[in-house]
């Protein structure tokens, strides 16, 4: 699987984080957003560094599988792009109206 950047992980957690166990979610949050190392998370949870690494890897895979099946983020981004195009078109319409009004005033 491809490596995810922080914004992608953030979206996955926002959309699907509640589908993970509390421990999985907390490990992801600690690692990616609280900037804790694997060793620090392991020490806080009294488990091995390898266990935390495996948990984070498994959790990311689960989040990606949720997205692959449900496509919530894909649909969200699609809607966002459509809204942006509508907004841009409305702005273009307003600019054209203003130009037409200016042309009528100058005649």
Swiss-Prot record:
Record Pfam families: UPF0122
Domain of life where this protein originates: Bacteria
SUPFAM superfamilies, per the entry: Sigma3 and sigma4 domains of RNA polymerase sigma factors (SSF88659)
Family membership: Belongs to the UPF0122 family.
Its biological purpose: Might take part in the signal recognition particle (SRP) pathway. This is inferred from the conservation of its genetic proximity to ftsY/ffh. May be a regulatory protein.
Name by which UniProt lists this protein: UPF0122 protein MYPE4850
């Amino acid at each position: 699987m491809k490596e995810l950047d922080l914004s992608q992980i953030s979206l996955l957690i926002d959309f699907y984080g509640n589908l993970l166990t509390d421990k999985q979610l907390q490990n992801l949050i600690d690692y990616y957003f609280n900037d804790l190392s694997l060793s620090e998370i392991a020490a806080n949870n009294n488990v091995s560094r390898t266990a935390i690494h495996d948990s984070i890897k498994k959790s990311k895979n689960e989040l990606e599988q949720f997205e692959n099946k449900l496509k919530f983020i894909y649909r969200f981004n699609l809607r966002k792009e459509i809204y942006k195009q509508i907004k841009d078109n409305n702005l273009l319409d307003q600019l054209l109206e203003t130009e037409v009004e200016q042309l009528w005033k100058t005649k």
